[in-house]
Amino acid sequence: MSIIYNNIFFDVYNLWYRVVNKNESLTDIGDKKVPIDAICKFFELTDGYIKKYGSVENCRVWYLFDNAKTSMMKNRKLLDKDYKKNREIQPDWFYVGINMIELITKYYRDNSVIYRVQNVEADDFVAPLIDNYINEHDKVLMFSTDMDWSRCLLNDTERDVVVNQYTRNNEILTVKSFEEKFGFKPTYSNVCFWKTLYGDQSDCILPTLSNYPKQYFLDCISKYTDVSRFISDALNGKITYLDAGWRIKIKNSAERMMLNWQLVSNLDIDNFDLENWKVECAYKPNKLLIIYNTLNIVGRFDKRVKNENKGSDLLSMLEGETVERV
């Protein structure tokens, strides 16, 4: 029997990359070029996921954004200039589309939330949100191909809480299927060790010990939850199966290993931050109609809003409205 989820988390940038293409059709709106078709595809995709996997009456939807272009990955960029380098070279319309998705989402549905904060990535939000807001009997499905999100996979039988991850090609990762696929449990430190040693091409994180034997890795994660202790014990000969060759490799890679660990570690976010940054959304058809008319997309993906009265325009609607960027 398939699970009906009452909490759905969307990695917005991750999904956006899936619906856009290099030759995206663009429409001139004022002085901006807007990827209208991609915006429509984004909401068709997310609406389809909610309809297929979400509980009809009480599904809470969480839209988690990475940073805007002007501040993207600032904290981690200070550590490594190549961090997520492959994600920065995007045309202006890409970010115009993201901003428009945020604006539409704000008025698109009740019982939904936006998180978008400078210098905070989407995967930084997931664990604290689950820790602070997911309750007994809740079922969570996270939509992201980012392995960092797998650190939150959970099957708590005592509290009847399940957290699964939809990755790609209709694959839903569970704690069990992750372990079958990768050979280890998806705990926070285990995934951090995996990415620290073997790298992560999607985030431009360089491998440090790409040929480290799997049995050595499994022993490592069974004994250590922090890379600094692992490095110290390896260099002091306390990991007895490591020969001189491996100790030299670890010594030469130690600085990069510490850097990788910082890059893959979550930011420290507490409940006060979450409450302060949370943007509660609400369905407001009049607001949506103004946006849809400006973009000429009335009826494209949202059949609820009809073009009965064009009302104001997008610029006047936005007068006085600001989106906090902490």
Can you describe what each PLM-predicted range is?
Residues 2-139, 154-169, 265, 271-272, ...:
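Noncatalytic, basic helical substrate-engagement surface that gates or grips nucleic-acid strands
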Residues 2-4, 24, 38, 252-257, ...:
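Low-complexity, acidic/Ser/Thr- and charged residue-rich accessory regions of DNA metabolism proteins
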Residues 124, 150-151, 218-219:
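Alpha-helical elements of the RecA-like P-loop NTPase motor core of helicases
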Residues 10, 145, 212:
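Single, functionally critical "micro-switch" positions that shape active/binding sites
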Residues 189-273:
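Accessory alpha-helical DNA-binding modules that contact the DNA backbone or grooves
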Residues 129-130, 142-208:
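Long, highly charged, low-complexity intrinsically disordered interaction regions
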